[in-house]
């Protein structure tokens, strides 16, 4: 897209961008750390965006553990996107499905 990523240290800019997207009529917000990122979107960012917006919130990039996935859900993500990790470790898919089901039934 040739867009410039916002640094995770600038939570205010990220929140304001998400608010602007919602005000412009976007149907969802996707917080993306980058495909195969070393560090996922922080819980603080997810929480801050969730508190200021009401559209569905998707979070992805850099999620490689079930803990990172459930942390994203706890922080306010409606959907967690995991891609590259499963390309390299498809055998872990059942673990993530079980963790998501366990989280959803709490």
Where are these regions (language model features)?
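Alpha/beta enzyme core
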Residues: 1-59, 64-106
């Amino acid at each position: 897209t040739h867009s410039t990523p916002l640094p995770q240290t600038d939570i205010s800019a990220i929140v304001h961008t998400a608010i602007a997207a919602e005000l412009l009529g976007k149907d969802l917000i996707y917080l993306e750390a980058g495909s195969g990122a070393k560090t996922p979107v922080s819980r603080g960012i997810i929480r801050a965006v969730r508190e200021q917006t009401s559209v569905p919130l998707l979070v992805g990039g850099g999620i490689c553990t079930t803990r990172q996935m459930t942390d994203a859900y706890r922080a306010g993500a409606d959907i967690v996107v995991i891609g590259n990790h499963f390309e390299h470790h498809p055998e872990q898919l059942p673990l993530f499905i079980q963790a998501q089901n366990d989280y959803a039934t709490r």
